[in-house]
């Protein structure tokens, strides 16, 4: 199929002073039709915004006028005409059409409202995601998500990191545990990978020095909360000859840069979401684990023993404490007990009970985990076995530590949680085009 009237502009690109009397063609969805008898207004929507098409009955071809009045909402149209300044119209102009071509007429009634005038439940919107994406707020979230990932790549690439890709079908659990999706790989059992961790460490032995990956991870955890997904997008780095303090600095600087870029490049999307974003101040506050549990025990009804994990109540308590003290939402919890961190986290030499590990937190939830890694083969093998895992199953990983593995550190941060906390989105599923959670496998 070839278009007789190819698009010349997005609706946001039309500049009256530059275009003059030249013809323009916009293509998109019929957002609204207002028939006032002697005048008809058609609002056409595309990815970048809206354009008002103005038809005055006495000044336009009767066939075009009658066709415009009968347009079905959400039909696909191509409109060609002359743009004129009109301060009351979207983007400050209107188009006086010489042709309106219906490229595909929508059925009626629609599965959901796209104007934002009628609210719909999240599951209703996800069931008809193709319609939900036509809502300005939904589009804004995914434009910002795109900018977040673009900024991440830009920041890390400029800092000398090489983008890599690790396999998503693996034979061994990355970090132990049972939260894996088993699959059949020809005649063998395999799993969907829960993290690129082991592979990015192997790359340190290969001499790539500093790497990053943006890709899917899979967790077979039966959470059913607003903060959890079973398929998510993880942003990971690994870097040789850097310790945990070094990579914490990389992480906080990257987060600040991402916020800067979103503010600079997605002002219209932020406006659509009615959000005024500010750049987090660096360096982020560092709260040792021992101090964190003291805060929880003193300021909440929850009690956390040393060596216990931090739940939702604890995270909120610490987050509020930090916010009151600094006015900032981002901070680190450092120096976690070795036994509750993954086997590859490096213990302190003078106190092996504490690891060189950290979580980067937002006021409302955990965003990232990282650590300096164990780079000594025998120590790493012993840690694997101390957690009840079979070291033979990690041979492909351990071999890389026998022949010259440099000291290295790294972290992973969830893209969805980063976007969710940035935009104060209530449910993490709103930050994924087609989310996979405990109950949803389609669309």
Curated annotation (Swiss-Prot):
Q: Where does L-aspartate bind?
A: 175, 219, 369, 373
* UniProt keyword annotation of Transmembrane helix present: no
- Which keywords annotate this record? Aminoacyl-tRNA synthetase, ATP-binding, Cytoplasm, Ligase, Magnesium, Metal-binding, Nucleotide-binding, Protein biosynthesis
GO MF, one example: ATP binding
Task: Tell me where the transmembrane regions lie.
Answer: none
Which Gene3D superfamilies does the UniProt record give?
A: Bira Bifunctional Protein, Domain 2, Nucleic acid-binding proteins
Segments for region (Aspartate) = 197-200
Q: Which GO terms describe its cellular component?
A: aminoacyl-tRNA synthetase multienzyme complex; cytosol
- Its Gene Ontology biological processes? aspartyl-tRNA aminoacylation
Q: Which reaction does it catalyse?
A: tRNA(Asx) + L-aspartate + ATP = L-aspartyl-tRNA(Asx) + AMP + diphosphate
Query: Which cofactors are reported in the record for this sequence?
Result: Mg(2+)
Which positions does UniProt annotate for ATP binding?
219-221, 227-229, 366, 414-417
Q: PROSITE patterns of this UniProt entry?
A: AA_TRNA_LIGASE_II (PS50862)
* Self-association state and partner proteins as the record states: Homodimer.
What protein is this chain from?
Aspartate--tRNA(Asp/Asn) ligase
């Amino acid at each position: 199929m070839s278009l007789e009237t190819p698009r010349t502009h997005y609706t946001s690109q039309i500049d009256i002073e530059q275009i003059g009397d030249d013809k323009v063609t916009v293509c998109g969805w019929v957002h609204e039709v207002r028939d006032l008898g002697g005048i008809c207004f058609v609002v056409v929507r595309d990815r970048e915004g809206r354009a008002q098409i103005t038809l005055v009955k006495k000044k336009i071809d009767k066939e075009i006028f009658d066709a415009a009045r009968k347009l079905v909402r959400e039909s696909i149209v191509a409109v060609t005409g002359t743009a004129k300044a009109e301060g009351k119209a979207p983007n400050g102009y209107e188009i006086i059409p010489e042709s309106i071509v219906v490229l595909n007429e929508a059925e009626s009634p629609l599965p959901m409202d796209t104007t934002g005038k009628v609210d719909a439940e999240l599951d209703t919107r996800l069931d008809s995601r193709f319609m939900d994406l036509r809502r300005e707020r939904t589009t804004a979230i995914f434009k910002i998500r795109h900018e977040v990932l673009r900024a991440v790549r830009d920041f890390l690439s400029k800092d000398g990191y090489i983008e890599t890709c690790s396999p998503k079908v693996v034979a061994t659990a990355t970090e132990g545990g049972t939260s894996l999706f088993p699959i059949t790989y020809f005649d063998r059992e395999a799993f969907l990978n829960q993290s690129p961790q082991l592979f990015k460490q192997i790359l340190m032995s290969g001499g790539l020095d500093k790497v990053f990956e943006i890709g899917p991870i899979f967790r077979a955890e039966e959470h059913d909360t607003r903060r959890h997904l079973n398929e998510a997008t993880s942003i990971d780095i690994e870097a040789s000859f850097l310790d945990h303090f070094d990579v914490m600095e990389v992480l906080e600087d990257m987060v600040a840069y991402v916020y800067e870029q979103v503010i600079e490049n997605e002002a219209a999307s932020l406006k659509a979401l009615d959000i005024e974003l500010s750049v987090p101040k660096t360096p982020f506050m560092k709260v040792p684990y021992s101090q964190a549990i003291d805060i929880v025990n003193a300021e909440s009804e929850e009690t956390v023993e040393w060596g216990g994990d931090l739940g939702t109540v604890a995270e909120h308590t610490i987050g509020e404490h930090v916010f009151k003290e600094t006015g900032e939402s981002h901070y680190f919890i450092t120096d976690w007990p070795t036994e509750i961190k993954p086997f590859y986290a490096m213990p302190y030499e003078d106190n092996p009970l504490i690891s060189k590990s950290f979580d980067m937190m937002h006021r409302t939830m955990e965003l990232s985990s990282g650590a300096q890694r164990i780079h000594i083969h025998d120590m790493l093998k012993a840690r694997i076995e101390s957690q009840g895992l079979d070291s033979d199953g990690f041979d492909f990983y351990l071999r890389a530590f026998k022949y010259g593995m440099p000291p290295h550190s790294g972290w992973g941060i969830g893209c969805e949680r980063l976007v969710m906390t940035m935009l104060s989105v209530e449910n993490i599923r709103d930050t994924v085009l087609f989310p996979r959670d405990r109950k949803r496998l389609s669309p």
